Regions:
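Short alpha-helix
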Residues: 124-141
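A short SAM/SAH-binding and catalytic strip from SAM-dependent methyltransferases
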Residues: 63-77
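Class I SAM-dependent methyltransferase SAM/SAH-binding core
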Residues: 7-53
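Core SAM-dependent methyltransferase catalytic element
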Residues: 141-164
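A short glycine-rich, Lys/Arg-flanked "PGG" loop and its adjoining helix->strand segment in the class I
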Residues: 79-91
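A short acidic, Gly/Pro-enriched loop at the edge of an enzyme's catalytic core
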Residues: 54-65
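Conserved beta-strand signature within the Rossmann-like core of class I S-adenosyl-L-methionine
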Residues: 92-100
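Short, glycine-/aromatic-enriched active-site segment of Class I SAM-dependent methyltransferases
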Residues: 107-123
Length: 164
């Protein structure tokens, strides 16, 4: 779970099957997630890595990397992060990305554009453009990208299922 904050989504994936192990990666110190790991009974199957996913190693030999609402932190360096994910995945591995899906002319989706409007007024380039992730993923070597656009609890977002 890359940039997974409290790690709850990653823990849900790990805990879903007894044969799964996983890594939670974020800037938060391990103490932030250790109680959740313990309460879910996953201490022997979960590793916590702290750091900056843009600057630090993210690990290796993963079958799945979750990158949920973190690609905006890679604006201007998206290929660099996607290459790092590509290199960290096993052959046939999957990178699951959820991002904002802002239209190139910034006219939609309305819920995402309105949420970022104060930042745009301040000249901040926030949000990931539609197809920005999938296009960059192909450029760094991923072989297949499946896209879905869904209304999630955080707004209308793209779900990219990207295969190595």
């Amino acid at each position: 779970d890359l940039g997974g904050a409290t790690g709850l989504l990653g823990l849900a994936v790990i805990g879903d099957r007894p044969d799964r192990t996983g890594v939670l990666f974020d800037r938060f110190p391990p103490a932030v997630v250790e109680e959740s790991i313990s309460l879910m009974g996953l201490t022997d199957r979960t590793e916590v890595m702290c750091g900056n996913f843009m600057a630090d190693r993210i690990g290796e030999r993963y079958d799945l990397i979750l990158a949920l609402n973190v690609m905006l932190f890679a604006k201007g360096r998206m290929e660099e992060l996607l290459k790092k994910c590509y290199d960290a995945l096993n052959p046939g591995g999957v990178l699951l990305v959820i991002s904002e899906a802002i239209l190139p002319d910034h006219t939609g989706p309305w819920d995402m554009v309105m949420g970022y409007l104060p930042y745009y007024f301040q000249g901040m380039d926030m949000g990931v453009l539609k197809n920005e992730v999938s296009d960059a993923a192909v450029r760094v070597g991923f072989t297949k990208c499946e896209k879905r656009t869904e209304c999630l609890c955080s707004g209308t977002q793209d779900i990219d299922i990207i295969r190595k």
